[in-house]
């Protein structure tokens, strides 16, 4: 069996799947990627590079499409060299987000294509119209529709698609739902687990354990899409209410999604100019090595996870795997996993006082939260463990290699989950919910 993986940032979502297939006797597994990416055990790596960047005069609606065409062209040219050398894949497995999969079936017409579809953009019911007071214009709608062009081409070309959550599937055009399965990549629950004697020593020398009031927040970058400005208002309130609480913030100062601030200002700098916190108890840890990051989760008394309707962060699932008590935003990606009061707590994304109230609820009644923590862990073991997810991924590749299609194979959603539509996005008008107390009143409190 010949398998070709394609991802510009090897191994990407295929960290476990590629070596698992390569370990099979008689399977020839190749990986097509950009130069300088890591090797994968048992996998033969091939590289491509872009001929150029999108042109400066390109219409801004078309910048993403031109970039995708350049990626697709480069990947196809590299694939053609592989074909000329005698390698013809039975199955191609590739991420559709950058355009690499658009033309691969033109090189290998007999191959079956399994596409990974991470996020299909929508003007409404998703991230764009979630921002308070943002008016979605005709320009926005046209730009977003065009932004999906490369994914649409890849969707049409794919024999089978996969996406990690039901909500992400719901964003895809309905006519393609029949050939898209929902399978998460999963992670190792023997590593991501609670640890009773976990301890974090901060740069200041302060040592924290599970016995302390530790509130955690994690994001790749500290930015609005992951609720960072809201969380800083929560941090201010926690500092005022709870003199013994420590707040650990993991994440860098860049922008992964959305817009950057003018003049190079970071969202952390902006937030610190707007709130009053105790710097001795609010700790910015930056990005952490994976083991240290897990230790932060393992000592957490409350983990706050906020997100726009967008791709669900692994950090929330890993926090649940560590038996963290999640206080999460009541937005569709979070609701798909967390049921309020059962395996976590949900709250209005924009209501910082309600979020602080739920943090108080957990810290004041930790004895009542033990079963919620355990159910959070069980949710992960049942639906997101690497053992289960990798087994499902391998079965999907095998089915595709044997000529089956999603319509011929029963795909069971993760346990306890229900289909999530595009509606129901939580978005409130400014002024809805409670307002912040005046600073002077808070200081008197």
Where does each model-flagged region fall?
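A short, well-ordered alpha-helix in the C-terminal region of glycosyltransferases
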Residues: 354, 361, 368-383, 389-395
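Conserved donor-binding/catalytic core segment of Leloir-type glycosyltransferases
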Residues: 203-226, 232-237, 247-248
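Aromatic "clamp/platform" in nucleotide-sugar-dependent glycosyltransferases that forms part
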Residues: 308
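N-terminal subdomain of nucleotide-sugar transferases
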Residues: 1-44, 427-429, 441-445
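Short hydrophobic beta-strand element within catalytic cores of glycosyltransferases
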Residues: 325-328
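Acceptor-binding helix/loop patch of EC 2.4 sugar-transfer enzymes
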Residues: 52-62, 110-149, 190-199, 252-262, ...
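Nucleotide-activated donor-binding/catalytic signature segment of Leloir-type glycosyltransferases, i.e.
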Residues: 251, 255, 260-287
């Amino acid at each position: 069996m010949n398998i070709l993986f394609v991802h510009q940032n090897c191994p990407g979502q295929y960290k476990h799947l590629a070596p698992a297939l390569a370990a099979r006797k008689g399977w020839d597994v190749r990986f097509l990627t950009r130069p300088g990416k890591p090797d994968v055990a048992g996998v033969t790596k091939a590289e491509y590079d872009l001929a150029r960047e999108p042109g400066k005069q390109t219409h801004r609606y078309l910048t993403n499409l031109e970039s995708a065409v350049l990626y697709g062209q480069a990947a196809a040219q590299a694939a053609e060299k592989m074909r000329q050398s005698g390698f013809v894949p039975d199955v191609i497995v590739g991420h559709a987000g950058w355009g690499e999969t658009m033309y691969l079936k033109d090189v290998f017409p007999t191959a079956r294509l399994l596409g990974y579809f991470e996020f299909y953009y929508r003007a409404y019911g998703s991230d764009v119209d979630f921002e308070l007071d943002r008016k979605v214009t005709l320009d926005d709608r046209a730009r977003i529709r065009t932004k999906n062009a490369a994914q649409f081409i890849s969707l049409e070309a794919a024999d089978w698609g996969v996406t990690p959550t039901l909500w992400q599937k719901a964003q895809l055009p309905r006519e393609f739902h029949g050939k898209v399965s929902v399978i998460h990549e999963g992670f190792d629950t023997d590593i991501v687990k609670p640890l009773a004697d976990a301890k974090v020593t901060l740069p200041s020398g302060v040592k924290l354990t599970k016995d302390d009031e530790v509130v955690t927040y994690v994001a790749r970058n500290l930015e609005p899409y992951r609720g960072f400005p809201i969380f800083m208002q929560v941090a201010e309130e926690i500092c005022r209410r709870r003199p013994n609480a420590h707040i650990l913030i993991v994440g860098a100062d860049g922008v992964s999604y959305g817009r950057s601030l003018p003049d190079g200002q970071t969202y952390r700098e902006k937030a610190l100019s707007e709130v009053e916190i105790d710097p001795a108890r609010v700790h910015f840890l930056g990005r952490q090595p994976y083991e240290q990051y897990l230790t932060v989760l393992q000592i957490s008394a409350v983990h706050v996870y906020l997100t726009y309707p967008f791709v669900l962060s692994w950090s929330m699932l890993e926090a649940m795997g560590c038996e963290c008590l999640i206080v999460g935003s009541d937005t569709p990606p979070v609701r798909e996993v967390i049921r309020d009061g059962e395996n976590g707590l949900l709250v209005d994304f924009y209501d910082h006082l309600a979020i602080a109230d739920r943090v108080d609820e957990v810290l004041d009644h930790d004895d009542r939260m033990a079963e919620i923590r355990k159910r959070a862990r069980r949710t992960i073991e049942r639906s997101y463990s690497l053992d289960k997810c990798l087994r499902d991924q391998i079965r999907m590749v095998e089915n595709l290699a044997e000529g089956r299609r999603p319509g011929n194979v029963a795909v069971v959603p993760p346990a306890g989950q229900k289909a999530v539509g595009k509606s129901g996005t939580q978005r409130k008008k400014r002024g809805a919910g409670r307002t912040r107390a005046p600073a002077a009143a808070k200081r008197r409190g």
